[in-house]
């Protein structure tokens, strides 16, 4: 009997597999970290073979440790780090280069050239995105231009492109299926969100052959089956795909227009469900596809913050101020406030709503009174301030008032941060009992496609662990936020040559 769904959650720092029962409970999980490669300043890469190796490894591990046979699995769903770009040889299945990660900034000069060509407004209106090295399109161009023989092979139909979801499905099906879903396609800067197809004008400008791109499918349907050699002969339907942030929006149950969530991971990612009509931002946000199910497309506004949890890792690994990420709450709590200190973690530039590829990190407001506690606290507060930047932009674009912010991801377990988040946005923050909503969303999408769950089931399993309500008065809130805005302004354009 098929009593379970498995979610494969392939993130920036690790690959995970989570096993769910029909009540939406986590039965077992497994996780393996993946190596970060930094070959040059502002370059970030992953070994695509390691991504597959770790992901297939945890898939097998979670079955073995749970004592579950593959034929007991009803479906597999995939949530993945978005924009990260893999190009591989169609025949051998081997990547031609390391995957270029979403954080990588090497293609900033290509982005500048696109702006000089007057494509800024065309790309914003048709893809919903801004021209930035964050997205896949310029990464594909860079790989075709810089890997020996790649462009010729691509034109001859010998190479395939995919975001991480495509790469995993290709391997799960042993090269039989080359697909992506609308959510991931909408993050490439090559996809027209109105025509719901690859954009020929952008492909032509970047000289990217359409033939190397995956077929685009809905977020909840059967794309293919695991190859008989992958999981002991079992052919399990792969039936749910969503980029990690859209998956979290779905996993949080943000099914109605105006509902919003924030995921605190390596970066911070806020998404607001805007319903069946795309809202083109005038305030530095992205317009993206939330999900596509049963022929209906739902859109979202997104604010992408590049550095969030990664700033806490920086405190631990680079500055050695803390031993573990969990220590951050303890040390931050030793100071009642950050004493006018602001940390702007623009290590890879600034994302929404600023979109400055040349901003760099800074600590502002240092005095002799400042010690470890203040710097740790200011670093945590930077996550909340960046969230406020995006929340304000979303209110302007959507013309909707935010009632509640739903949160998930590792850092949302930090009570001090969640209280400050509520204080600085002046809104209730809700934390669910299961904070692994990214994996949950992919599981839900997969289960829906095979009839394991229905929409009513998904609404029943949403449970709130804690609510944080504002305790800071409005004048203090605005004074602190004004200091943040001043600090951000100082960091902008820092790494520009001229």
Swiss-Prot record:
Chain residues that bind ADP: 12, 16, 266, 309, 410, 414
Alphabetic keyword roster: ATP-binding, Glycerol metabolism, Kinase, Nucleotide-binding, Transferase
A GO BP entry: glycerol metabolic process
Residues involved in glycerol binding: 82-83, 134, 244-245
Gene3D superfamilies: 3.30.420.40
Catalytically driven reaction(s): glycerol + ATP = sn-glycerol 3-phosphate + ADP + H(+)
Entry GO MF terms: ATP binding; glycerol kinase activity
Similarity annotation: Belongs to the FGGY kinase family.
Self-association state and partner proteins as the record states: Homotetramer and homodimer (in equilibrium).
Protein name, UniProt field: Glycerol kinase
Organism name: Natranaerobius thermophilus (strain ATCC BAA-1301 / DSM 18059 / JW/NM-WN-LF)
Gene (name only): glpK
């Amino acid at each position: 009997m098929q009593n379970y769904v498995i979610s494969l959650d392939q993130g920036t720092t690790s690959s995970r597999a989570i096993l769910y029962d029909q009540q939406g409970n986590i039965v077992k999980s497994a996780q393996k970290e993946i190596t970060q490669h930094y070959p040059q300043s502002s370059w970030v890469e992953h070994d695509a073979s390691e991504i597959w190796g770790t992901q297939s490894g945890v898939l097998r591990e979670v079955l073995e440790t749970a004592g579950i046979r593959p034929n007991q699995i009803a479906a597999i769903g995939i949530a993945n780090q978005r924009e990260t770009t893999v190009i591989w040889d169609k025949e051998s299945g081997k990547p031609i280069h390391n995957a270029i990660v979403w954080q990588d900034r090497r293609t900033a000069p290509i982005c500048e050239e696109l702006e000089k060509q007057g494509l800024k407004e065309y790309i914003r209106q048709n893809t919903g995105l801004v021209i930035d090295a964050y997205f896949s399109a310029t990464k594909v161009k860079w790989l075709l231009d810089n890997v020996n023989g790649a462009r010729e092979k691509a034109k001859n139909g010998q190479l395939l492109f995919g975001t991480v979801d495509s790469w995993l499905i290709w391997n799960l099906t042993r090269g039989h299926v080359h697909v992506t879903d609308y959510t991931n396609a909408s993050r490439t800067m090559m996809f027209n969100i109105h025509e719901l197809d690859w954009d020929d004008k952008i492909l032509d400008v970047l000289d990217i052959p359409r033939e190397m791109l995956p077929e685009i499918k809905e977020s909840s349907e059967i794309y293919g089956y695991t190859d008989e050699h992958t999981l002991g002969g079992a052919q399990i339907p792969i039936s749910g795909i969503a980029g990690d942030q859209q998956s979290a929006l779905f996993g949080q149950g943000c099914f109605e227009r105006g509902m919003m969530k924030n995921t605190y991971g390596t970066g911070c990612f806020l998404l607001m469900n805007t319903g069946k009509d795309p809202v083109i931002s005038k305030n530095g946000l992205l317009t993206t596809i939330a999900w596509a199910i049963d022929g209906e497309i739902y859109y979202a506004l997104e604010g992408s913050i590049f550095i969030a949890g990664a700033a806490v890792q920086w405190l631990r690994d680079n500055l050695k101020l803390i031993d573990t990420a969990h220590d951050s709450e303890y040390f931050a709590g030793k100071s009642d406030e950050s004493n006018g200190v602001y940390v702007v973690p623009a290590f890879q530039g600034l994302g929404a709503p600023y979109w400055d590829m040349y901003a760099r990190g800074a600590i502002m407001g240092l005095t002799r009174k400042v010690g470890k506690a203040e710097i740790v606290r200011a670093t945590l507060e930077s996550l909340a301030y960046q969230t406020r930047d995006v929340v304000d932009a979303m209110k302007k674009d959507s013309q909707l008032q935010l009632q509640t912010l739903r949160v998930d991801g590792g850092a949302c377990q930090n009570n001090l941060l969640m209280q400050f988040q509520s204080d600085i946005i002046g809104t209730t923050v809700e934390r669910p009992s299961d904070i692994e909503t990214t994996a949950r969303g992919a599981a839900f999408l997969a289960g829906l496609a095979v009839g394991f769950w229905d929409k009513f089931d998904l609404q029943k399993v949403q449970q709130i662990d804690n609510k944080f309500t504002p305790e800071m008065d409005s004048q203090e809130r605005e004074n602190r936020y004004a200091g943040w805005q001043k600090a951000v302004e100082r960091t902008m354009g820092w790494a520009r040559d001229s």
